[in-house]
């Protein structure tokens, strides 16, 4: 577990007794949750289903599908960086950069 201890004198100590594999798994899970949350905030499940069924006009369906694909690709980019990390700090430093939301969603 990674712990941060802040002292009254302003000194900060970081304790990290996780293995690299544990740190990688923890970060991948966090980014997976962030990706899902980002998609669901932008395109709720009902919107995703309607787009998959083609209920909306084709341009909107395509924009929704492309946004979800962009989020998935960003997650996969991050996952690759995390799995290539050689230290816990390197794995923890990988951040998800949400793709821009297309107009018309």
Write out the residue ranges for each language-model feature.
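A preference for well-ordered globular domain cores
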Residues: 1-105
């Amino acid at each position: 577990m990674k712990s941060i201890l802040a002292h009254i004198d302003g000194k900060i100590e970081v304790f990290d007794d996780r293995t690299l594999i544990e740190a990688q798994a923890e970060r991948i899970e966090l980014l997976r949750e962030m990706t899902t949350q980002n998609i669901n905030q932008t395109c709720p499940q009902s919107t995703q289903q309607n787009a998959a069924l083609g209920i909306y006009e084709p341009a909107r369906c395509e924009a929704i599908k492309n946004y979800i694909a962009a989020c998935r690709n960003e997650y996969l980019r991050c996952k690759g960086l995390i799995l290539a990390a050689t230290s816990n700090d390197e794995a923890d430093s990988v951040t998800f950069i949400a793709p821009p939301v297309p107009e018309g969603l």
